[in-house]
UniProtKB/Swiss-Prot annotation:
Short name of one Pfam family: Ribosomal_L4
InterPro entries: Ribosomal_uL4, Ribosomal_uL4-like, Ribosomal_uL4_dom_sf
Protein name per the record: Large ribosomal subunit protein uL4
Gene3D superfamilies in alphabetical order: 3.40.1370.10
GO biological process: translation
Species of origin: Novosphingobium aromaticivorans (strain ATCC 700278 / DSM 12444 / CCUG 56034 / CIP 105152 / NBRC 16084 / F199)
Length: 207
């Protein structure tokens, strides 16, 4: 699959880039993408802190007060949730959200996410060489008209000037190739890859 290389303002750049069909030419499957996104979001969740319940608190278990004639309820011990210092009724318990997912399924999900963006209009730029000026980058992206949410993926590391210029632009996010993931790719309107990012991603699956 050949894609025209563009400049950051959306104009035609130099030459074309050949995208591997093994990475960018798959037919996306909703069930695979759903499994990978669910796995990602579950792994982001923190572990809930356990609350001390009635059996966990250290209070006397001796019955206080008489059974009859005291004019009060027939309480058995001070651990009951209605007392100050008593256990929590139906409190939160420790839950592990780190579900496992086969590496091959994760890799397949990422390739399908890239393929879905390739079908929708993947953008490839030569590089991210810009001045570290937010105003200038905003003007370029406005001309390109890539949508409200744009994910830009660079090669080994993100270009410093581009990262500085883009960090205050709402809806523009930047990642190195090693950070490419299904959730971030799917939640953006447009995926922009540099030549270096294409090489890194293809080497990631073919290496």
């Amino acid at each position: 699959m050949k894609v025209q290389v563009l400049n950051l303002d959306g104009t035609a750049g130099k030459g074309e880039v050949e995208l591997s069909d093994d990475v960018f030419g798959l037919e996306p499957r909703a069930d695979i993408l759903h499994r990978v996104v669910t796995w990602q979001l579950e792994n982001r969740r923190g572990i809930a802190r356990k609350a001390r319940e009635r059996s966990d608190v250290a209070r006397t278990g001796k019955k206080f007060g008489r059974q009859k004639g005291g004019g009060t309820a027939r309480h058995g011990d001070r651990k009951a949730p209605i007392f100050i210092g008593g256990g929590k009724a139906h409190g939160p318990r420790v839950r592990e959200f780190n579900i496992s997912l086969n590496k091959k399924v994760r890799a397949l999900g990422l390739k399908m996410a890239l393929s879905s963006k390739a079908k929708a209009g993947l953008v490839v730029v030569d590089n991210l060489d810009v001045d570290a000026k937010t105003k200038a980058l905003v003007g370029q992206l406005a001309k390109a008209n890539w949508g409200k949410k744009v994910l830009v993926i660079d090669g080994e590391g993100v270009n410093d000037n581009f990262a500085k210029a883009a960090r205050n632009i709402v809806g523009v996010n930047v990642l190195p190739a090693i950070g490419a993931n299904v959730y971030d790719i799917l939640k953006h309107d447009t995926l922009v890859l540099t030549r270096a990012a294409v090489e890194k991603l293809e080497a990631r699956f073919n290496g």
